[in-house]
Amino acid sequence: LVLTFDNAARLAARIGETTITTEPLTIRQWVDVALTFDQATGRLRLAWRPVTAAADWRSTEATGLEAPAARTPSVLTIAAAGPASPLATFDGRIENLQFYPRALSADEISRSRAAQAPLADPLFAFDFARETTTSTLVDTGPNGLTGRLVNHPARGMRSSRWSGHEMCWRHAPGEYAAIHFHSDDMTDCGWPTALDWQVPADLKSGCYALRIEAGGETDNIPFFVPPPKGRPTAKIAVLVSTFTYTVYANHSRPEFRLSQRWRKGWLGQAAEWNAYPHNPGDHPEYALSTYNDHVDGAGISISSWHRPMLNVRIGYITYPFPDIRASGLRHYPADTHLHTWLEDQGYDFNIITDFELHHEGLDLLKDYTVVMTGSHPEYHTREMLDALEAYRDAGGRLMYLGGNGFYWKIALDPERDGIVEIRRGEGGIRAWAAEPGEYYNQFDGEYGGLWRRNGRPPQNLVGVG
């Protein structure tokens, strides 16, 4: 039994070879949907109504059908056709998902919707307003059939009962009981492990890259080695902006997609300079950055380093000639110039990253004489700013060597490292704007957006901004 959308924006219910459909639905409008199948009569019924006070239920049905053969074990998937691969994926919001071991009557369906609660005997009833910071779906029914989200769809989203009275999902969870699924959500490719390498205990702190070759092609995968925890090996620390790299990961610039001149210039310059040849604009299968949109037009709010990040590569250029008469480098490729200069000048330094700064705080910094940023330290958690301010106020020397720094507030997935969230709300230079009422992070429930709007402008930390 499958419920999906067709290309005409109609809901389609299918059992065996029989399909019934609704009328075309209005985009960005909440709709109540009830799908029932009565095994005794072979009746398949699909009912729907817009979620407005005056709307009536409409329905379509087919009769005389045979029940599908049971499959054991069975897996229910939401917003996709199957668990093994992302087939027939869904773009849109879902809330208040209930399943029953029998076909409900029209009256029971109406009563359940009016009460905003399941009836007494659900097989399971998911309340998406619970455990919002996690990937867990809570079943409020008697069977406790917990669900699991894959690839981090957006939570803490406005649902059908949103009134606008509360802007924070923690204060009115029933008004933020929706999950926004996107067909291009991806925080992990899910590839099997091809290589396992243990970093030697005596490897010098620094920036490294794994060079791989296959089928006549080569690639490089950068990684960073900090000193042993609690044992700095130099007086200089270079803070690598790994969270900023992740937020920008696979940024598909509009110029590359929309301008043939710009695209030709980028490809030509990459070839002429022997630069990294792959542009994220040609590879949306690896998921784009939080500076891009999902395929349904919603801004991408979650990014991950558990996937290829094509612009976090040695030799990747962002801007080609003649648009910019310079190196064309940003972020990681630009920051490597600082690392190389320090090495050439004979300075001993340690590499530390945003990850260690967030988790270790001031303890990470306190033994360094100076901490240097890279060229573009833009995205930070509260814990990171707290640590940098404490280091500075204790007499530490913080060298801000970049621009556009300490600008956006981010949240980290509490369940898994390497997954970052940004809500672009209420001000700032934004690639997209969060919807009203959706300015609070799903990962920690805090108000997101600019650090300036959280009372901590960059000028407070480094004097400029």
Spans of model-derived segments:
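Helical hinge/lid and interdomain linker segments adjacent to catalytic or ligand-binding clefts
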Residues: F181-T187, D196-Q198, D202-K204, I324-P414
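Short, aromatic- and glycine-rich surface loops/edge beta-strands on solvent-exposed regions
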Residues: G206-I212
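Short strand-edge motifs at loop-to-beta-strand transitions and within beta-strands
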Residues: V31-V33, T193-W197
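Aromatic-Pro/Gly-enriched surface loop or interdomain linker
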Residues: H152-T187, A214-L364
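A glycine-anchored, Pro-Gly-centered beta-turn/N-cap motif
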Residues: R28-Q29, K204-G206
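Extracellular beta-rich ligand/substrate-recognition surface
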Residues: A12-T18, S183-W191
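A glycine-rich, often tryptophan-bearing local segment used as a flexible ligand/cofactor-contacting loop or short
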Residues: E378, R382-G465
